Amino acid sequence: MPATPRLHRKRFAPLAIAASLVASTTLGLSATGTLSAFTASITNSNNTAATGSLIMQETDSAGTTSCLSTSGTGNAYTSCSTINKYGGTTNQLTPGGAPNVTTVRLYNTGTTAVNGFTLAPGTCTKSGSGTGDLCGQLQLTLTCAPVTGGTAGTAVTLYNAVALNALGASKDIKAASATCVPPTSSTDYVRFTFSVQLSSSADNTVQAQSVSQPLVWTYTGA
């Protein structure tokens, strides 16, 4: 009976070899990528984004002297000393006399609309030999009016004969009048008129005094 095992091995050897060849061929096709399929794709090659800008510009009444927010660090210019809204020390005031009147223009030359607009008066400080407090005797009347196409709109009063030391921490100009918010424009603006007058009740204690008070305009973007 020794011949039987040899015949059995001979009968199945070709089948095993064939199966091995088929597996090798399939594996080879898979590895070399010769098997293919339909595909589809889209590449969006132009995906961009940008931010808008808020740029405040203040000029004198003639539009010849100008300060820009971009002149300072972080779009906040803190050294605009060329535009004096209280009239300066040359035009000296007397009790109940004529006021110092100054006008300025506020523009938004950026690309983003102004959503909030405030004016923050700083601390009024006096100097001079008098013993009285001139900050409490000088009164400010402030109005604003939009100017579109060279034509001024209706003026709105923001302060009406308020003492400089009582102006408060901040004035919400948009809340007072949305028409006084500068548009996004290089030509249209808001005109602010500052009128500073010495109270008729002022006495000799405020003679030979002067005052100084910083004013901070702030735009907030939409």
Regions found by a protein language model. Name each.
Residues 2-222:
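Long, small/polar-residue-biased beta-strand-and-loop interaction regions
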